[in-house]
Amino acid sequence: IVRDTIRLEEQAAQKSVISVERDDHVYRMGVIDLPTFYVDFDGRSSGKTDYRSTTRDVARLVKELQAENTDGLIIDLRGNGGGALTEATTLTGLFIEQGPIVQVKNAKGRIEIKRDSDPTIVYRGTLAVLVDGNSASASEIFAGAIQDYGRGIVIGEPTYGKGTVQNLVDLDRYARNKDEKLGQLKFTIAQFFRINGDSTQHRGVVPDILLPTARDD
């Protein structure tokens, strides 16, 4: 339990404030570094009212940054390989009124639209999303939705290009011998599409503002 708590703490969203000088004016920008999309599934399923999640933590940090009179907000998804799909949906909901966030198509061709149904907007100010080639999966859902809604500017490199949904099966429970370790099996169960119909698979999200990288040299 202690180890899991420490791990969640290490992956949790963190805030900072940076100063940017432009046209003889110094702007104070709030930055939220988000290493992964996480949720305390055990806490939520057990009925804990204060369970941790990406959306809950970011909402709290945004309010703290607003109290510090920041001029804008940057969500840093660089290196964020994804995580809980539901958190990508609810996190987007902090910045839009309500509406579809992502389309999920299963192996039978059935399409399910994941929506934000909460009209509450936590932050209405200037918004930028930083991405790189390691921003994948849930990161691409969030960045793509922010871009499609015109809610903020996506800055950085084209993202990883992972537009599929995987499921993880623990094979140990099928072992004949309880001491036998068979590991886990991950397999693709669905593909997701942006609300504009585009797939991010092998394409990624192309930023509104492209920044040069070391790979470009």
Model-found features: residue ranges?
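Short hydrophobic-aromatic micro-motifs
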Residues: 30-32, 187, 200-201
